[in-house]
Amino acid sequence: MTDIHQLWIAAILGLVEGLTEFLPVSSTGHMILVGHLLGFEGNKAETFEVVIQLGSILAVVVMFWRRLFGLIGIHFGEVPHEGSGQGRLTLIHILLGMVPAVVIGLLLHDQIKTLFNPVNVMYALVVGGVLLIAAELLKPKRPKSPGVDDITYRQAFMIGCFQCLALWPGFSRSGATISGGMLVGVSRYAASEFSFLLAVPMMIGATGLDLYKSMGFLSMADFPMFAVGFVTAFIVALIAIKSFLHIIKRISFIPFAIYRFIVAAAVYALFVL
């Protein structure tokens, strides 16, 4: 594989990662599909995916840096507030949202690793799509928490319970948390914003652990490829997050669910038939 070819693969996969990581469509499903089509699979590919995920995480940090610093009591200028009441999102909300998935993830780590195969990803894409549709149909007409600062401790914990579904590869962490948020009375926009904020510590922890385990597959010769993938994922994720938050004010998640079914069909056609 030539250097130019590697850089093209890095750019394409960085584009896919940045576009899908925070949308409720499953980045895992897309990376499996595209990686297979490009012939980029194996230990090096898995390590590359871990590295470019850090680019996506950085996009969230840049997008919500003021809010993230506020969670730990560091404020720059006016303190952001998005809600109809006097409540405020705190670090406790984030911790409550993390606990269920962290506990289940640690207890079932080995079993979860066995789920990383195309067939399980295909099923997760379908079930996650059904959950998105259910969230749209069953959500309260008037959400109890229209803004992210209205989210209660109970709602944060319940969203965290839904996040456990994302331990199933292909389910989509954002899809699980946003759907869960809507079902417990959080508005579509606020649930999406909370999902992004919750992603930072969750993904840093998971990605950091995966990167540590993958250090043996890293070499300086791969630096240009990994750098291109990282930067591409960062830029595309930044654009994707801004666009997504703008779009969901106007449309439901049902189109995303339908798209998931299409991706599941593609996985079936490529890996099962």
From Swiss-Prot:
This protein's name: Undecaprenyl-diphosphatase
Family: Belongs to the UppP family.
Organism from which the protein derives: Erwinia tasmaniensis (strain DSM 17950 / CFBP 7177 / CIP 109463 / NCPPB 4357 / Et1/99)
EC number: 3.6.1.27
Pfam families: BacA
Topological relation to the membrane, as annotated: Multi-pass membrane protein
Annotated compartments: Cell inner membrane
Keyword annotations: Antibiotic resistance, Cell inner membrane, Cell membrane, Cell shape, Cell wall biogenesis/degradation, Hydrolase, Membrane, Peptidoglycan synthesis, Transmembrane, Transmembrane helix
An example Gene Ontology CC term for this record: plasma membrane
PANTHER family: UNDECAPRENYL-DIPHOSPHATASE
Keyword Membrane: yes
Catalytic activity: di-trans,octa-cis-undecaprenyl diphosphate + H2O = di-trans,octa-cis-undecaprenyl phosphate + phosphate + H(+)
Note: Bacitracin is thought to be involved in the inhibition of peptidoglycan synthesis by sequestering undecaprenyl diphosphate, thereby reducing the pool of lipid carrier available.
